[in-house]
Amino acid sequence: MSDVELAYAVGQTVEVTAVDVAQGGWCVARPEGLPVLFVRHALPGERVLARVTEVTSRFARADAIEVRDASPDRVEPPCPNAHPGGCGGCDWQHASLPAQRALKASVIAQQLRRVAGLELDAEITVEALPGDEPAEPGPTTETTESTETGQPGLGWRTRVQFAVRPDGLAGLRGHRSHEVIDIGDCPIAHPAIRDLGLLDYSWEGAGTVEAAVGSPEPADPGHQDSVVILTKAGRAPRGRRAPGSVPGNAAAHDERGRVARDRSEDRAVEFFPQEAVDSVEAESVLIRSAHRLTPLRGRQFLTQFAAGRHWQVNAGGFWQVHPAAADTLSEAVVAALEPKPGDTALDLYAGAGLFAGVLAPLVGADGAVTVIESDAAAVRDARANLGEYPWVAVHRNDVSLAVKDAGLPQARLVVADPPRAGLAREVVDYLTGGSQAERFAYVSCDPATLARDLGLLIAGGWRVDGLRAFDAFPMTHHVECVVTLTR
């Protein structure tokens, strides 16, 4: 057995002092004579009683079940489910918003220093998004009212996926757990999602029920797209399948009231409660199966408004979940790339084409923008969103393959917004090898993979000219960064 396994056992309690913050919403404790312990629900500087929840050969995890010496940054969580054994969706509800941002800034700096060997000249600060700005400068200043809820840091999440228990109750899972918690409400969910009342229905037969809302145009704030997406549970409830296929937007139901899809059309039978599907006041209700969305009613996309225009986004596709994030990140990318008329640009992991759509009018008809995206639905959206710009070419391809294609046009400017796993190694090799790019805007939602990639890019001749961090996910440990690299 390892030293950690000899020192700790699940359920054991130990009094510790949290001395630092770690990636993932944890605090670090170093009890005298014992291995390092990663503790949730604590804050740096606090002395807490921690209960061990997990032991591995390399480390142990614990929950702070009693605070014996509280930090001045500690606040009462706005959600009653934000406690040990409760919902696992949020990490920092027990910290003030300015303290949350300071913790995230510390994690970014740690990762850059430890992984990339990078110390930035300027101190890293995590910026509040519009609606959550501090009223005055300072690390512990209270924030102004949120544009969505009147409460800072709440009501921002425009997409939420709830898990469904076998009895049909929808909720959220506990931290690192398969248990579905009966939460009753989710304060970080957008008001338009909360108004759907998904937690009031029985979703027996579903594995998940997901809700997403579009962002309305400021001139017409009363209209907001909404969609509910259902997936089947691992094993459907018993019930006779309704005969025949389900054409168009109509829904067929079996004799027990569950929505059914014909196997010949969907390759699977989907059963969902008729009352919930018929009653929920979403504009669109869809079933997700085999990477496909099938409408029971409504349409398969949401309309988002950002950068002064509308965007078509597949109902199950990627879009920033904070209402102010798309605008904020677009502005940051433009500032990082400094596009000029006639420039050439490459948008990697482009999604629905947000950054390409912002760059296209700036480089103009004498320039060119190449878009690479692997997801078929996102490519359809990007082509619809960018069709007004003949100088934009949208390609469906795996980014790691596209950058090895000798026919890929050279570009002076590159922007990449990869998933949490970061840049594919082929992309790093391209940027440090065959690419002739002079400026690179790296949009990242994970400080650890960002630091890994920056270390490789710096070794390959790039230099970091600036980093901006944004609190696009209040109450959680997640943070969005835009890094400017030049060479």
Predicted segments with their positions:
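Accessory RNA-recognition modules of RNA-modification enzymes
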Residues: M1-A416, A421-V427, Q436
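S-adenosylmethionine
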Residues: H395-C481
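Conserved beta strand-loop-helix elements of the APE1-like EEP
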Residues: V482-R487
